[in-house]
Amino acid sequence: MNPPAIAIDGPAASGKSTVAKLIAKELGFTFINTGAMYRAVTWYVLQQGIAPADTEAVKAILPGIPLSFGKDGAVSTVMCEGRVLGEELTLQSTNDNVSTIAAIPEVRALLVEKQREYNLAEPVVMEGRDIGTVVFPNTPYKYFVTASEEVRAARRAAQGLTDSIAERDRKDSARACAPLTMADDAKLVDTSDMSIEQVVAYIAEDIHNRMA
């Protein structure tokens, strides 16, 4: 039996990454940012001069893609040829194309396998868009973190990103492979009128109570 896995899903700018990282620290679990994995593939595809919409070309480079996934302490890292990727993952070009890359079934299959490997030997808090529905469908600890479109748009603007929240939601929810959707047994957490501290306290208390 694998160690516990906490699944935190939600749309863009819902606050799920910050919440998941703090929950992991609270519990002493490893934090896994799956979005960084999809962003790394997106960045690499663009570096090769491949159009993200050219599905066959993207699929062709997957077997030899020089990305590796590890940890820095209790936080997951993504590396390209041994170099940890950082600002590359937050470039506007990466952000604009990650939904297209994430919709390719072969990309998702590759990364879901890597994501599950993290949980083979240690407990994890994993955030993304399909953690509770695809990666860990059997975990009892599922949370869907969201916020109003207006609040999320303001958060994106504060990060210096100019993409449309509505368009990103449409792409993530409409894709055929592992669309963004709330698991039937997940708890909905609306962060529109909550501070990060309140959200973390609510989820951490729920987890502690259920693990007791």
Task: Label each PLM-derived region with a short phrase.
Residues 37-123, 150-151, 162-167, 196-200:
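ATP-dependent small-molecule kinase phosphotransfer cores
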Residues 8:
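Hydrophobic anchor at the beta1->P-loop junction of P-loop NTPases
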Residues 24-34, 47-51:
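Post-Walker A helix-loop "phosphate-sensing" segment adjacent to the P-loop in P-loop NTPases
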Residues 70, 115-122, 129-138, 158-202:
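Small-molecule kinase domains that catalyze NTP-dependent phosphoryl transfer to phosphate-bearing small molecules
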Residues 16:
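Conserved lysine of the Walker
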Residues 19:
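Hydrophobic positions on the alpha1 helix immediately C-terminal to the Walker A/P-loop
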Residues 13:
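Walker A (P-loop) phosphate-binding loop of P-loop NTPases
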